[in-house]
Amino acid sequence: MANRKYFGTDGVRGKVGAYPITPDFALKLGWAAGKVLASQGSKMVLIGKDTRISGYMLESALEAGLAAAGLSAAFTGPMPTPAIAYLTRTFRAEAGIVISASHNPYYDNGIKFFSAKGTKLPDEIEEAIEAMLEQPMDCVESAELGKASRINDAAGRYIEFCKGTFPAHLGLEGYKIVVDCANGATYHIAPNVLRELGAEVIEIGTDPNGLNINEKCGATDVTALQAKVVETKADVGLAYDGDGDRIMMVDHLGNKVDGDQILFIIAREALRSGQLKGGVVGTLMSNMSLEIALKMLGVPFLRANVGDRYVLEKMVENDWTLGGENSGHIIIADKNTTGDGIVASLAVLAAMAQHKLSLNELASAVKLFPQVLINVRFAGGENPLESDAVKSVAAEVEKRLEGKGRILLRKSGTEPLIRVMVECQDAELAQQCAEEIAEAVKKIN
């Protein structure tokens, strides 16, 4: 990826009111994107958002910029990120825009784009938009200005899409499901999908007020969900994040089931039904137990860098259709073009219904190895991971862990931190090894 000023791996993101998440920048970004897309023959762009209060401000500014460049905008209102990927395709729009900062707190927001195919914009288009941002803003002739409209049935369309991914011969009658929508974009989608498939649904995190998105709820904090599942004697709990592209689950005993376990359940079911194409892509942070469990099934496994963008890249590279992260981003490429929390959760529920097994039973094949993560701050300058002393300690630890665990040493891309991760079946050994490496890193300081 070329050096970017604004676009990161997941669009433009930051604190609301601080550049670039300001109304004037959103206006200019809408105009710049409009100019570039119009030059490709575009006429209409979809705009969706999550439930943050700043979404109103940003969607209005983006729409004004697009209109000035001659493009019309269609608003969907609060809608999960994967819904915008899907709706952009089905509405034959030239692009889709999502206003969201995913799992971040309400005071952050972001703007990202989808292509007409519902995939991330090609790098060259993002680079052209960045270049256009440096140009003075102008306005097309009045007769050529874009218009704004609202899509009133966007939620209903996406609900039907989600239900369509669930096997027609199965239903969720008899299941009691607690769903936590993080007070985010799935609040009016997920409960309806589950009810229409026959489940009894108990809702938490479905009362957004613009400020409570991801606050002690959703995929990043399942504590309330665990308590509610146990209290109501539910069969399963589902937790989505603020923009609906992540899923975490809770079994009937209140145990958290993470993205690695969810990925395994979906992979095994796809293998059984003959629908698994190739292998599975995880990340550098995927638990070693996932790799071992897949190996026992004869399923190839590859690790990508952390980030759903990199998972998807490796899937495309290998022509595989399944990948994900332990954080709950699960991409089932033959169903949607991006991580889709609702679709992934339905795939797991279908496996439960098909085999009449509990989530606890399905997840038991992946007994997660303890992971010890230590962040070591350093003074900047030389990267401690390049030091011979650190390399020597790391090599000695790797030898000790051979066959039983692994280490991962990463320099943070945003802070002067070295992240030391040790994973091992033996929790004490993992802790000891992580501390040894962390100590070696500290000495370099």
UniProtKB/Swiss-Prot annotation:
Post-translational modification: Activated by phosphorylation.
Group of enzyme by EC: isomerase
Residue positions of the active site: S102 (phosphoserine intermediate)
Gene Ontology MF: a single term: magnesium ion binding
Protein's UniProt keywords contain GTP-binding: no
Gene Ontology biological-process annotations: carbohydrate metabolic process; peptidoglycan biosynthetic process; UDP-N-acetylglucosamine biosynthetic process
Catalytic reactions of this protein: alpha-D-glucosamine 1-phosphate = D-glucosamine 6-phosphate
Binding-site positions, Mg(2+): S102, D241, D243, D245
Regions crossing the membrane: none
Cofactor(s) needed for function: Mg(2+)
GO cellular component, as recorded: cytosol
Keywords assigned: Isomerase, Magnesium, Metal-binding, Phosphoprotein
Enzyme Commission number: 5.4.2.10
Modified residues (Phosphoserine): S102
Cofactor note: Binds 1 Mg(2+) ion per subunit.
HAMAP family: GlmM_B
Role noted for this protein: Catalyzes the conversion of glucosamine-6-phosphate to glucosamine-1-phosphate.
NCBIfam families: glmM, PRK10887.1
The protein, known as: Phosphoglucosamine mutase
Organism: Haemophilus influenzae (strain ATCC 51907 / DSM 11121 / KW20 / Rd)
High-level lineage: Bacteria, Pseudomonadati, Pseudomonadota, Gammaproteobacteria, Pasteurellales
